Design a protein with these regions (language model features):
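Short, glycine-/small-residue-rich phosphate/pyrophosphate-handling segment
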Residues: 29, 91, 95-140, 148-153
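N-terminal beta1-alpha1-beta2 submodule of the flavodoxin-like/Rossmannoid cofactor-binding fold
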Residues: 1-81, 85-86, 144-155, 159-162, ...
Length: 179
């Protein structure tokens, strides 16, 4: 039995001056401290969409973390394009969210993404890591100013994601998921 799972961390903003790489960098650091996961960072600013490479990387993943800002009460257009460029690669796999933004911390974007992933037959994880006022929540080195709370939230999300990744990988192997 394989005890590790493949996690794709998708950085959803492509804007100049974006904060996503800071948030994603911290989260990837948390994930890499674990021995139950391998991490592939897919930064949409550096990834052509659509592409065979993107499809292959999403297809190879057992689980996903979407790192998303909230722009105008929603998630970024390039993230929607990336998600919609594929279909079967998302099915019967868990998706977690790390969001950031102003007062809402990106949670409105996350709630919209939950509906999109439900339509793609993916399973979204209830727990979310969220940073309101994100620019003030990290120091100049990309470390959360309240590391205990942030690291605890990341740990809970990663624990739940691992459970679902293993359960759904086993289910997909035993009973291939239909359309």
């Amino acid at each position: 039995m394989t005890t590790t799972y493949a996690l794709a961390v998708i950085v959803g903003s492509v804007r100049a001056g974006r904060f996503g790489p800071v948030v994603a960098g911290w989260f990837v650091g948390q994930a890499k401290q674990r021995d139950d996961v391998t991490v592939d960072v897919i930064d949409l600013a550096d990834t052509p969409i659509p592409s065979a490479d993107f499809a292959s990387r999403i297809g190879a993943a057992d689980a996903f973390i979407i790192v998303t800002p909230e722009y105008n009460h929603g998630y970024p257009g390039p993230l929607k394009t990336a998600i919609d460029s594929l279909g079967p690669q998302w099915r019967a796999k868990p998706v977690g969210f790390v969001s950031y933004g102003g007062l809402s911390g990106g949670l409105r974007a996350v709630e919209q993404l939950r509906a999109v992933f439900a339509e793609l037959h993916a399973v979204t994880i209830r727990e979310t890591v969220s940073f309101h006022g994100a620019h003030e929540r990290f120091d100049e080195h990309g470390v959360p100013r309240d590391p205990e709370a942030a690291n605890t939230a990341a740990g809970v999300l990663l624990d739940q994601l691992a459970w679902w990744a293993h359960a759904l990988r086993h289910a997909r192997a035993a009973h291939p998921y239909g359309t």
